[in-house]
Amino acid sequence: MKEKTIIIVGGGQAAAMAAASLRQQGFTGELHLFSDERHLPYERPPLSKSMLLEDSPQLQQVLPANWWQENNVHLHSGVTIKTLGRDTRELVLTNGESWHWDQLFIATGAAARPLPLLDALGERCFTLRHAGDAARLREVLQPERSVVIVGAGTIGLELAASATQRRCKVTVIELAATVMGRNAPLPVQRYLLQRHQQAGVRILLNNAIEHVVDGEKVELTLQSGETLQADVVIYGIGISANEQLAREANLDTANGIVIDEVCRTCDPAIFAGGDVAITRLDNGALHRCESWENANNQAQIAAAAMLGLPLPLLPPPWFWSDQYSDNLQFIGDMRGDDWLCRGNPETQKAIWFNLQNGVLIGAVTLNQGREIRPIRKWIQSGKTFDAKLLIDENIALKSL
């Protein structure tokens, strides 16, 4: 019997890890990866950090260059897909080539959510999703230049830190009343706000751009009435899923390809993962997780489901952010208001814990990354703690 053919569409973390997971889990059939980028699949997190700060930055490949040939994965880089061929099981490229598939994994990622007022600036306005974006930003982030960043989420703050370290004059504009409001607990939000302000970043909360004039400098008029002059304008206000191919194939979409708990779409032969995917929960709500680890996890889950294998046991959600000399790691549930703090954030070393009825459900470490491993185990096991002991620095965490 002829083995099935699996095609992966995409060139990022989820796509590469889907290929790796399929081979690791025993798939020996024909495996193809199609990407519109000419690079081998590369890591996205460094784009806002090391790619802007290092003297001679290099793209960090998700898998070694020789892995693809050694594992008999056919790479098709720099190509554009015309149709997925859901009915015919024939993927068609714009150059006329067609490729048969039995199962499909879509990991086309996402673009920056548009901001028309700034997009009208053309090349004077920047977003950050790809290696080319980072290269363009690196050229313009020069000392003493005035940089305005719209959006104080993870990407916005990482860019603010990198631009400041490149000796730019940075202002961040945020519509909400806080920074990193979507994915950090309140005490961490407060710490980050103060950290950036101490570094010289001006952060304008509860504000937005109302009018833009393009001249020698970009003139930005805010809702507050203030006018800013900028050499460089960057924005990061969320994502717009690259779902067009899926939508044209009549898959369920909602600013993302709708998947179930095993990454399967409404077509049992088509799976999706990474930033392009949005999961329908048991209660019917849609949930998207934009992180490096989620891309890896969904690739593993989809590979197992495609091969009819038991699903891997996944750790609690985890992501990290590097800002200035700080490394922050977020694990577990970030919701809730009653966070405990171990250590002193003013010394740039602390851990915030989220206890629910004594059970540890989430944590954030500040320059304490070595503690993530035991914390992960505690969250997975539902370990209970005495709050006083947990925050007592005289008691080693490993002894609890």
Curated annotation (Swiss-Prot):
Pathway(s) served: Aromatic compound metabolism; 3-phenylpropanoate degradation
EC assignment: 1.18.1.3
Keyword Protease: no
Gene3D superfamilies xref list: 3.30.390.30, FAD/NAD(P)-binding domain
Gene Ontology BP annotations: 3-phenylpropionate catabolic process
A Pfam family hit: Reductase_C
Catalytic activity: 2 reduced [2Fe-2S]-[ferredoxin] + NAD(+) + H(+) = 2 oxidized [2Fe-2S]-[ferredoxin] + NADH
Chain residues that bind NAD(+): 146-174
Keywords: Aromatic hydrocarbons catabolism, FAD, Flavoprotein, NAD, Oxidoreductase
InterPro entries in the record: FAD-oxidoreductase/Apoptosis (IPR050446), FAD/NAD-bd_sf (IPR036188), FAD/NAD-binding_dom (IPR023753), FAD/NAD-linked_Rdtase_dimer_sf (IPR016156), HcaD (IPR023744), Reductase_C (IPR028202), Ring-hydroxylating_dioxygenase (IPR053382)
Cofactor: FAD
A molecular function (GO) term: ferredoxin-NAD+ reductase activity
Binding positions for FAD per the UniProt entry: 5-36
Class of this enzyme: oxidoreductase
Database matches in SUPFAM superfamilies: FAD/NAD(P)-binding domain (SSF51905), FAD/NAD-linked reductases, dimerisation (C-terminal) domain (SSF55424)
GO cellular component terms, semicolon-separated: cytoplasm
PANTHER family, alphabetized: APOPTOSIS-INDUCING FACTOR 1, RIESKE DOMAIN-CONTAINING PROTEIN-RELATED
Record text on subunit structure and interactions: This dioxygenase system consists of four proteins: the two subunits of the hydroxylase component (HcaE and HcaF), a ferredoxin (HcaC) and a ferredoxin reductase (HcaD).
Assigned protein family: Belongs to the bacterial ring-hydroxylating dioxygenase ferredoxin reductase family.
General function of this protein: Part of the multicomponent 3-phenylpropionate dioxygenase, that converts 3-phenylpropionic acid (PP) and cinnamic acid (CI) into 3-phenylpropionate-dihydrodiol (PP-dihydrodiol) and cinnamic acid-dihydrodiol (CI-dihydrodiol), respectively.
Record's protein name: 3-phenylpropionate/cinnamic acid dioxygenase ferredoxin--NAD(+) reductase component
Organism: Escherichia coli O139:H28 (strain E24377A / ETEC)
Taxonomic lineage: Bacteria, Pseudomonadati, Pseudomonadota, Gammaproteobacteria, Enterobacterales
Name of the encoding gene: hcaD
